[in-house]
Design a protein with these regions (language model features):
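Aromatic-residue-lined binding/catalytic grooves and analogous aromatic/hydrophobic interfacial grooves
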Residues: 1-457, 475-477, 495
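Active-site neighborhood of glycoside hydrolase catalytic domains
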Residues: 462-496
Length: 496
């Protein structure tokens, strides 16, 4: 088995979240597990939770494109022909750009699950046999330790077939599981580096609880996008609900089941919205999962995940090591580090499977896959079409994970709608209603068809980005030889 394993909990900072917390995901949802002692924090995401884009009832959204910018192209060409490069540069910098405003948006963190174990002491000094790990052969994160003669264990995974993120708590020994649990909007991480305290003002929501679980419902303030998550619980202990908190006492086990959704739809004609009863949807998903025992959920997850992961094996002849992953990285020797290289290779496959699966309205892996702890992520955690989205999917086909690329293909197909406006306004190529007559994208993109150039010409003008992305799209056919998919999906994109 391929394992990441550590002998210390995650630091409660952005740096800790980024470099230490362990990621799980089912393509749509992602979570980072901190692996704490006497408490736990699981920060989670849902890939369609974004600010920016059109309002639900918008009639004038156009993908950020300014009007009539193509009219300067002839003047730029003339300046270049005359050798007046400075004039051409100035014209391009003034005209071949897009807006820098809130409508661009950013990928938002969804929320945090917190647990405080009322009969446990915090801190590494109060436990023995501490282990925090991620088995990437089964896509399960584990935290375990022994305190006062009782071993406590937590397993977390994000299931694609059951569409829930699951955390199972168990114990061996005399002590029971007694803990307080809550589910909140994103809470701030301790500042470090470039990330000061992140007081999020992008979302508003409310929490309601009963003995079955915790419901979080809200909206993104600037665009009205609706979201909801439901955290259900299944346990042999006593559960009480009060003021947004659940308290569990006297349990030998507890299974937490999380579902998170938004009303985003990959459909520009509906302003990227769909009519959905979010509360009923997330509760129904959790209740369906709750009807299954933990081992069934776990086995469903492993079987689905391994149907993709087990297709490729890499044996470089390395020797198995008892080192923690941190120690292995610090002592890496290119002549003897084959086992770490195997792990690194398979970890990349794990991350793609976990952040990109085919599902209705699914988005591709963004700059951070599906994982984001703050509401001001680097580069908005968006979709960069000048190399980064291509890079996400370069390994997909040659590593026998073609299915993970379908969300990327659908996303690029969707970009054509506002890409036709970009072609009209920046290249003078007119597309009448419904006519497939050419499309254009640039460096940055969002789930909302943002096709205009970036707000700085130096990095934002990238008119070949769609052609480059289409290489990734066409690779799906080259590796699968699916002629029906080529004819119905890929070829119309290529032709236009």
């Amino acid at each position: 088995n391929y394992q990441l394993h550590y002998d210390q909990p995650t630091a409660p900072s952005y740096d800790g979240w980024e470099k230490q917390a362990l990621p799980v995901g089912n393509g749509e949802m992602g979570a980072k597990v901190f692996g704490l002692i006497g408490e736990e924090r699981i920060q989670y995401n849902e890939k369609t939770l974004w600010s920016g884009g059109p309002q639900p009832d918008s009639t004038d959204y156009n993908g950020g494109n300014y009007q009539d910018r193509y009219k300067v192209l002839a003047e730029i060409r003339k300046a270049l022909e005359e050798g007046n490069h400075q004039k051409a540069k100035q014209l391009a910098e003034r005209n071949l750009v897009g807006p820098n405003n809130a409508q661009y948006g950013r990928y938002l963190s969804f929320g945090d699950i917190f647990m405080v174990f009322n009969n446990q002491k915090k801190g590494l000094e109060n436990v023995t046999d501490y282990h925090r790990g991620l088995d990437i052969s089964e896509a399960i994160s584990t935290t375990s330790y022994t305190q006062d003669g009782t071993n406590f264990k937590r397993e977390t995974f994000s299931s694609y077939p059951d569409d829930v993120t699951v955390t199972h708590l168990s114990k061996k020994g005399d002590k029971t599981l007694d803990f307080t649990l809550w589910n909140s909007l994103t809470e701030d991480l301790i500042a470090n580096g470039d990330y000061s305290w992140e007081y999020s003002n992008y979302k508003q929501g409310a929490v309601t609880t009963d003995s079955n679980g915790i419901l979080l419902k809200g909206t993104v303030k600037d665009n009205g996008l609706k979201f909801a998550s439901y955290l259900g619980i299944k346990t042999d202990g006593q559960v009480t609900a009060q003021d947004g908190y659940l308290t569990v006492t006297g349990a030998s086990y507890a299974t937490l089941l999380l579902s998170a959704k938004t009303n985003f739809a990959q459909n520009p004609k509906t302003n990227y919205r769909k009519d959905i009863d979010l509360e009923n949807t997330v509760k129904s998903i959790v209740e369906a999962a709750k009807a299954k025992d933990y081992e069934t959920l776990k086995n469903n997850h492993i079987k689905d995940y391994q149907s993709l992961f087990n297709r490729v094996q890499l044996n470089l002849g390395g020797n198995k090591s008892s080192q923690t992953t941190k120690e292995a990285l610090h002592t890496y020797n290119p002549e003897k580090g084959q086992k770490l290289e195997e792990l690194f290779f398979q970890y990349g496959r794990y991350l793609l499977i976990s952040s990109s699966r085919d599902r209705t309205d699914a988005l591709p892996a963004n700059l951070q896959g599906v994982w984001n702890a703050v509401d001001n992520p680097p580069w908005n955690s968006d979709y960069h079409l000048n190399v980064n989205l291509q890079m996400n999917y370069w390994p997909a086909y040659m590593n026998n994970l073609a299915e993970t690329a379908k969300s990327m293909v659908n996303y690029i197909d969707d970009m054509r709608y506002y890409g036709r406006i970009a072609a009209k306004e920046y290249a003078g190529i007119e597309s009448k209603e419904g006519q497939e007559n050419g499309w254009l994208v640039h460096t940055q993109a969002t789930p909302f068809g943002w096709t205009t150039p970036g707000w700085n010409y130096y990095w934002g003008w990238s008119p070949a980005a769609n052609a480059w992305m289409m290489q990734n799209v066409y690779d799906y056919y080259k590796f699968t030889k699916d002629e029906t998919y080529l004819k119905e999906k890929i070829y119309p994109m290529l032709k236009e």
